[in-house]
Regions:
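N-terminal beta1-alpha1 ligand-phosphate binding loop
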Residues: 2-24
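Aromatic side chains
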Residues: 7, 48, 56, 70-71, ...
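FMN-binding flavodoxin-like domain, especially the glycine-rich phosphate-binding loop
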Residues: 16, 24, 28, 33-35, ...
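Short, Lys/Arg-enriched, disordered terminal segments
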Residues: 1-2, 201
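Short Gly/charged-rich anion-binding patches and loops
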Residues: 20, 103, 156
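Short acidic active-site motifs
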Residues: 39-44
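Conserved catalytic breakage-reunion loop centered on the nucleophilic residue
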Residues: 150-203
Length: 203
């Protein structure tokens, strides 16, 4: 799966997030390309299965100047169906945190991009460990959403279900699900009787 990561960073925080996402994507076998947005031709995004865009916000509510050309070129190409997810670091105490992300994502939606409905916004004073953890989780969920191939979705769910950091929540979820019957192919059964693949499909 080909993944593009484009970013602009002023203090280095958004760049760190981009690197963390890149490392996670490579770890699961994706072919990853990462570049600064001010060096990218917008129409190149059509060559990728999935894109991540990372931005800082200038003057609390403005698009950074490095992303202006990228922003202006969006309306020149048909991007129907191109999948993209957004991330960035900024002042989350502000009334419009990471506003540049909202500005760019809104325009990309208008011109056909399939935009992931969750945005990863990290406070600019967050610890490196917190950034790493959130970026890894975000990258995994975006990959599941963006993949058209079942083997990728099953692979990522299997990694999450087997990961120590998810074991407690998965255990509790299974306890709840096992207590309630569900209808599957016209019959009522306990979820606990299904195979692992069926559980993944039902989630």
């Amino acid at each position: 799966m080909k993944v593009f990561i484009g970013y602009v960073s002023l203090s280095g925080n958004t760049e760190k997030m981009a690197i963390n996402i890149k490392n996670r994507m490579k770890a699961v076998g994706c072919e990853v390309y990462m570049e600064r947005l001010d060096t990218v031709e917008v129409d190149a995004l059509k060559d990728f299965d999935l894109a991540f865009i990372g931005l800082y916000t200038w003057n609390l509510e403005e698009l950074p100047y490095e992303a202006n050309e990228f922003y202006e070129e969006i309306d020149q190409v048909d991007f129907a169906g191109v999948k993209v997810a957004f991330f960035g670091a900024g002042d989350l105490t502000h009334s419009k945190p990471c506003a540049a992300i909202d500005i760019l994502s809104n325009k990309m939606k208008q011109f056909g991009f399939d935009v992931y409905d969750q945005v990863l916004k990290i406070h600019h004073e967050s610890s490196t460990y917190e950034q790493l953890s959130k970026c890894e989780d975000f990258a995994e969920h975006v990959l599941i959403w963006g993949s058209n191939r079942k083997k990728w979705r099953f692979f990522m769910w299997d990694r999450m279900l087997g990961s120590p950091k998810y074991q407690k929540s998965v255990f509790l979820l299974r306890r709840v699900l096992d207590d309630y019957p569900i209808k599957y192919k016209g019959r009522s059964k306990k979820r606990g009787t299904y195979t692992r693949t069926s559980e993944i499909r039902d989630f």
